[in-house]
Design a protein with these regions (language model features):
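Solvent-exposed loop and edge beta-strand segments that line ligand/cofactor-binding
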Residues: 124-128
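Short arginine-rich
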Residues: 160-170
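Short linear motifs at protein or domain termini
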Residues: 1-49, 168-174
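Generic secondary-structure boundary/loop-capping signal
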Residues: 18-21, 101, 129
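Conserved amphipathic alpha-helical segments that form helical-bundle/coiled-coil interaction surfaces
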Residues: 27, 53-120, 132-142, 150-161
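Glycine-rich loops and low-complexity Gly/Arg-rich segments
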Residues: 37-38, 45-48, 109-110, 121-122, ...
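A generic membrane alpha-helix/interface feature
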Residues: 41, 119, 130, 164-165
Length: 174
């Protein structure tokens, strides 16, 4: 675990002393979410060239149907929330699966660990869940209509809005 913190840039290793966990500043969050938005948008562009578009569209549609539970209930149970977060995260990962670019996926994986600390916390709240679902649905609609440029732009906007939740959470943690 300590080695992973180090690899993800969330820790500093001191020989014979241990690892010091680094806290993220607002500037760090800004850079992380902006870059992640760029990577996610790029994964959409790469995925749009994959020969099995029907397979990707089907998986995205199933994901949207699964996460739509936030529109149907006032509040999710703890177990439903955990399942929803996993499915919500998977929405992003499906584009990487179809991007067929291991270096893009590896770069995103390295950053994702740093963002997960925040997203797993704010995605437990009702308002962010609903807004994230609506944003995913818009991305899906653009992708389904083969407007890949719009889908990529919407993904970047989605990460920018997620940044606001992360900053709010960061302020609460101080």
């Amino acid at each position: 675990a300590l080695t992973r913190l180090n690899e993800e840039g969330r820790g500093e290793d001191y020989s014979n002393i241990g690892v010091n966990v680094i806290s993220l500043t607002d500037q760090d969050l800004q850079e992380l979410y902006q870059f992640m938005g760029d990577l996610d948008a790029l994964s959409i562009r790469y995925a749009s060239r994959h020969p099995d578009q029907e397979g990707l569209r089907k998986r995205l549609e199933e994901n949207i149907a699964l996460t739509a539970v936030v529109e149907e209930k006032d509040t999710l149970t703890g177990q439903e929330t955990s399942c929803w977060i996993k499915a919500s995260d998977h929405f992003h990962l499906m584009f990487y699966d179809y991007a067929d670019n291991s270096r893009l996926t590896e770069a995103a994986d390295r950053l994702r660990g740093q963002l997960t600390i925040f997203s797993n916390a704010y995605e437990r709240e009702d308002r962010p869940q609903r807004e994230i679902f609506r944003e995913h649905k818009k991305i899906w609609e653009a992708y389904r209509q083969k407007d890949y440029s719009a889908a990529a732009s919407l993904m970047k906007e989605h990460l920018n809005r997620s940044l606001l939740y992360a900053k709010e959470l960061s302020q609460k943690m101080l």
